[in-house]
Every structure is written in C-alpha cells, then in structure tokens.
Regions:
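Charged catalytic cores and adjacent phosphate/nucleic-acid-binding surfaces used
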Residues: 1-24, 37-42, 87-102, 134-294
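Short acidic, glycine/proline-enriched helix-loop-strand junctions
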Residues: 7-9, 60-80, 174, 184
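Surface-exposed amphipathic alpha-helices with a cationic face
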Residues: 16, 21, 67-72, 109-125, ...
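Short, well-ordered coil/turn segments that N-cap beta-strands
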Residues: 18-20, 48-51, 75-79, 120-123, ...
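Histidine-centered divalent metal-coordination motifs
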Residues: 25-27, 57, 128, 193
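Divalent metal-dependent hydrolysis catalytic cores, especially in the metallo-beta-lactamase
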Residues: 29, 41-61, 121-125
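Acidic-and-aromatic substrate-binding clefts and catalytic sites of carbohydrate-active enzymes
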Residues: 30-34, 55-62, 103-105, 131-137, ...
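Binuclear metal-dependent hydrolase catalytic cores centered on His/Asp/Glu-rich metal-binding motifs
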Residues: 91-123, 130-131, 137
Length: 294
C-alpha cells in the first residue's frame, strides 16, 4: 500500500461506527478570514480533517462555495454550512446546518431566531465562552436559551484560548457553571482567520462518533452530542494534545486511543518511514486515520 497516496475518504465504509475529526469554526475571505474556501479545504485535507464548518460572520457564501468544491473533488473534507452570529459584545454563537444568512441578534429576537434555527434542523454552539460579557443581560440570555434547549454545546477548545495564561481555570469554571449542570456537548474549533501564532486549521477540533460518514451523519452526531473536543498542534505550548468531553464519549475515545497505543508497539514490522508516519499521526491526534492504516 502506498501510504503517500492513501485516500481516507474512499476507504471509509458507509455504515460503520467510527470517529471523524472536524474543525467547526473556520473563517474565509467572505468575512474576515485570509483563505478562500478552496485554500481552506486544501489545507484541511492535507492535515487529515474529515470535515470543516466554514463559519463566516453572518454569511454562508463561503460554506456554499466549499460544498460545491467537495462535490467536484471527492478527496476533500465534507463541508458543513455554518455562520458565526453576534449577540453583542463578543457574545457569539455558531449556527451549524443553516441555509440562510442570519444578521446579528438582539435581546428581543435571539430566542425566536434560534427557535427557528432549531426547527429547521440547526445546531447552536456558544463560541469562545470566555469572551461572553459577565453582565446580567448576557448571563440571563444564556440561561433562557438553555432552559428552552436551544444551545447544543459550548466551544470550550478554541485556539485563541491558548493566549490566556489561566485558561485551565477558565475551562473548569465554564464546565462547572454551564457544561456540567446543563449536560452540554463540548466542541472544539480553531476560529481560524490567518496563519498566526499557531492558530491553524485543526488546532481546535471536534471528534464525532458517527455511523454514516456523510454530512447528515455528522449532523446527527452533533445533535446527539456524541463528541469530544480536542486541542492539538499548538507548537511549544504545554496545553497541546488535550481531550475533553462528556461521558460516555470521552471514555470511548480514550479506549480507542489506548488500543492504538497497543498496536503501535508492534510497529517493527513496518519500514522506518511508515513508523515515523504512524507515530506522527498518533501524536497529532489523527486516531481514526491511523486506525484505518493499521
């Protein structure tokens, strides 16, 4: 088998439980990003991502362009239609599986807008939660949304967090205040705009347990909250290589990773170039890709 030309997308069985890796927060030139959708997909494919959500600010042109590209080139990652929408003062939400652009929310319409988004099959994620204003109106708004079951999860791992000195304390506080009590899913995304300070596509990511490798299979996993957030690839930072998620999915992914560790012990039968590739894939968190190769 020629490892250099191995096509992961074509190798995926259509009906089998597996982990897919997605970056759910990427900006393109259609908002304030520096990459075209084509460049995003090329980079994501080269870094073994199975899916990406192109999430421009109140805009889905980038996502639609990306989806058109994937229909022509099957080796590219799947594209989820998404957008990032502001409720004011860095209080942002990721709307995944959306069909129309959504202008910024206000206090009067956010509940009705997210209710309609949910009715149409959409997923709602609170983005970079540490930037949410510590104001009564924002916290009250989030509680109302959670009480109405309109928020599916929180983007706990966003590569911007690694610029915060006490980020672990912040993560634990968010877990204790919001994620744990409301049993929210834990998501990861790079919030990629440009190649800057290690904030690369795939740095923040989400592992999703899917039965069908398809856009609908990924949406189903998001809705069922079968996911674990990962943070990888931030060079020279002690926080690289983290996995956080709700049970049973966190333990499930951990067992999957431990089984791969056992298989890696027997790498002596492979040429050295393959051994280096396998170890690099493991250290970079590309677990399902590695499992398919082994």
């Amino acid at each position: 088998m020629a490892i250099s030309t191995f096509n992961l997308n074509n190798s995926k069985p259509s009906q089998k439980w597996r982990w897919v890796t997605a970056d759910l927060h990427i900006h393109s030139i259609y908002s304030d990003g520096g990459f075209t959708p084509a460049q995003i997909l090329k980079y994501a494919a080269a870094h073994f991502l199975d899916a990406v959500a192109i999430a421009d600010h109140s805009e889905i042109k980038g996502a639609m362009e990306g989806k058109t590209l994937t229909e022509k080139e099957l080796h590219l990652p799947l594209v989820l239609k998404a957008q990032e929408v502001s409720a004011g003062n860095r209080f942002h939400f990721l709307l995944v599986n959306c069909n129309t652009p959504q202008s910024d929310f206000n206090k009067e319409n956010i509940l009705s807008c997210l209710t309609e988004h949910r009715r149409q099959g959409g997923i709602t994620i609170l983005a970079h939660p540490w930037t949410m204003p510590d104001a009564k109106w924002a916290r009250s708004c989030l509680r109302d949304l959670l009480a109405a079951d309109l928020v599916d999860g929180i983007e706990l791992f966003n590569s911007a967090a690694l610029e915060i000195s006490n980020v672990r304390d912040i993560w634990h506080r968010i877990w204790e205040e919001w994620i744990g009590p409301y049993q929210l899913a834990v998501f990861g995304g790079s919030d990629f705009h440009h190649l800057h300070k290690g904030r690369y596509i795939g740095t923040g990511r989400t592992y999703l347990k899917v039965y069908s490798y398809s856009e609908q299979g990924i949406i189903d996993a998001l809705r069922a909250r079968r996911c674990v957030a990962g943070l990888f690839g931030f060079k020279n930072d002690k926080e690289s290589g983290l996995l956080w998620g709700q049970e049973p999915w966190s333990a499930d992914l951990q067992r999957f990773r431990e089984n791969l560790q056992k298989k890696l012990i027997g790498l002596s039968r492979y040429p050295s170039v393959y051994r280096r590739l396998f170890l690099n894939l493991y250290e970079a968190g590309h677990y399902q890709y590695l499992a398919d190769l082994l």
